[in-house]
């Protein structure tokens, strides 16, 4: 008679399953909405496509030192959105750019997307404020309150747009006193 031995501890499959669950949880957390921030409804993706200028942002290493920052959005063949971010790096004397892809999280009538610049890793892109009449400016958040942008169709905006952005973002708990206003004139 052959006796079966039983290993003590978790089965290898269960550890693998746990690790996979943790990775999935981490990835989902990056595409979640910051608490209390609601994406705009009745979003019109075709009107959002095109070039946007970064007017203000919170600081992040991937944009640090860049001027003349823009984001350009166009349709992908798979129905998603192609994202091309570009900025001038004066220290290097050259343009930096990153290309990514974005997909709507809950349907294209809501300004809530997930965007990736690196493989399977996505972050939230939440349009929570928008000039609905002309799509001239947009208030954008990432997965938490450390990501915040004011985008516009032109390199400058009226002071009233900036004031509204600061007021709305501040009321939602964003650290608006840390905003960087992007130089859209320096560089080549």
What are these model-derived regions, one by one?
Residues 3-19:
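Bacterial N-terminal signal peptides that target proteins for export
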Residues 17-28:
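Bacterial N-terminal signal peptides
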């Amino acid at each position: 008679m052959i006796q079966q031995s039983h290993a003590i501890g978790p089965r290898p499959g269960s550890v693998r399953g746990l690790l996979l669950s943790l990775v999935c949880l981490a990835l989902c957390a990056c595409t979640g909405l910051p608490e209390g921030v609601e994406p705009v409804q009745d979003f019109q993706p075709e009107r959002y496509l095109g070039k946007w200028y970064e007017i203000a942002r919170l600081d992040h290493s991937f944009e640090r030192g860049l001027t003349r920052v823009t984001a350009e959005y166009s349709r992908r063949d798979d129905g998603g959105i192609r994202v091309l971010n570009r900025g001038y790096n004066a220290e290097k004397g050259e343009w930096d750019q990153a290309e990514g892809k974005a997909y709507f999280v809950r349907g294209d009538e809501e300004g809530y997307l997930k965007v990736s610049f690196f493989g399977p890793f996505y972050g939230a892109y939440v349009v929570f404020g928008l000039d609905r009449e002309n799509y001239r400016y947009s208030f954008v958040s990432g997965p938490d309150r450390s990501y915040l942008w004011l985008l516009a169709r032109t390199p400058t905006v009226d002071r009233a747009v900036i004031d509204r952005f600061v007021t709305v973002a501040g009321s939602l708990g964003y650290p608006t006193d840390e905003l960087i206003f992007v130089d859209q004139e320096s560089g080549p």
